């Protein structure tokens, strides 16, 4: 039998702002109204300020572990902006901006990281799950929530966030495989900052892109510039 090609594929990468912050009028025109842009910028500024306060609290011994969101504000906010209010937002620990946009008060973030369980007492109508600290577990939760919505005939999805290091966890593969096989309406949003805790991305994953891992499960996949809210 001759050697044949079983699969060829490509992964698109979307970026509306270039590396100098210049806006592509052709690609980005009318994506976000000006009034909304101002509100989104205010929310990113609030997230950055909370980060500064929380970091000082942590360094002064008044707060335990606190993972900073600095530099990753745009990605969770952009996702939260385009989701419907009843879609599930299933986060880990660097999505403060998306949580603010959905309506979670900043003080609840601080309560959570200071060990006060009232920080996890989230209003049901916000459709937000408690912040997941164990690496990767939230992906299974999101898959289950989206599966339940599909079973009930609801027109809603779940969007779950995780870092590149989480793609080496078993929970990631279980969730992806289950979601793909049952055609579950869930978005797996990988925030690749090229560090798996203290391990560089090039060491924890030898694939050229994290996005290509979705191809193995028969899923659609795309790369977006995580610092570009238009993307």
Spans of features found by a protein language model:
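Charged, compositionally biased N-terminal leader segments and the immediate start
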Residues: 1-29
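Structural signature of the thiamine diphosphate
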Residues: 5, 230-231
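N-terminal glycine-rich anion-binding loops that anchor highly charged ligand groups
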Residues: 14-21, 42-55
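Conserved beta-strand scaffold positions in the cores of enzyme catalytic domains, especially
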Residues: 16, 221-223
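Cofactor-binding active-site loop characterized by glycine-rich and histidine/acidic residues
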Residues: 49-52, 56-182, 200-206, 211-218
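Short, ordered loop/turn segments at secondary-structure junctions
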Residues: 94, 191-194, 226-227
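Residue-level marker for buried hydrophobic side chains located in beta-strands
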Residues: 161, 188-189
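Short, proline-centered helix/strand-breaking motifs
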Residues: 185-187, 220
């Amino acid at each position: 039998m001759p050697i044949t090609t079983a699969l060829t594929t490509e992964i698109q990468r979307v970026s509306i702002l270039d590396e100098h912050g210049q806006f592509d009028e052709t690609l980005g025109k009318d994506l976000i109204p000006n009034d909304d842009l101002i509100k989104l910028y205010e929310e990113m500024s609030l997230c950055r300020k909370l980060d500064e306060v929380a970091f000082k609290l942590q360094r002064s011994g008044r707060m335990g572990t606190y993972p900073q969101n600095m530099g990753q504000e745009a990605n969770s906010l952009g996702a939260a902006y385009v989701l419907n209010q009843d879609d599930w937002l299933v986060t880990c620990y660097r999505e403060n901006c998306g949580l603010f946009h959905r309506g979670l008060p900043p003080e609840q973030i601080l309560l959570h990281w200071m060990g006060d369980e009232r920080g996890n007492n989230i209003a049901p109508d916000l459709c937000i799950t408690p912040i997941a600290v164990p690496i990767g577990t939230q992906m299974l939760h999101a898959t289950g929530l989206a599966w339940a919505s599909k079973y009930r005939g609801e027109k809603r999805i779940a969007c779950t966030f995780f870092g590149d290091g989480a793609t080496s966890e078993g929970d990631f593969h279980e969730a992806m495989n289950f979601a793909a096989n049952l055609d579950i309406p869930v978005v797996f949003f990988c925030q690749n900052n090229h560090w798996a805790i203290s391990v560089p991305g090039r060491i924890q994953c030898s694939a050229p892109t994290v996005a290509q891992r979705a191809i193995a499960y028969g899923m659609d996949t795309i790369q977006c510039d995580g610092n570009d809210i238009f993307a």
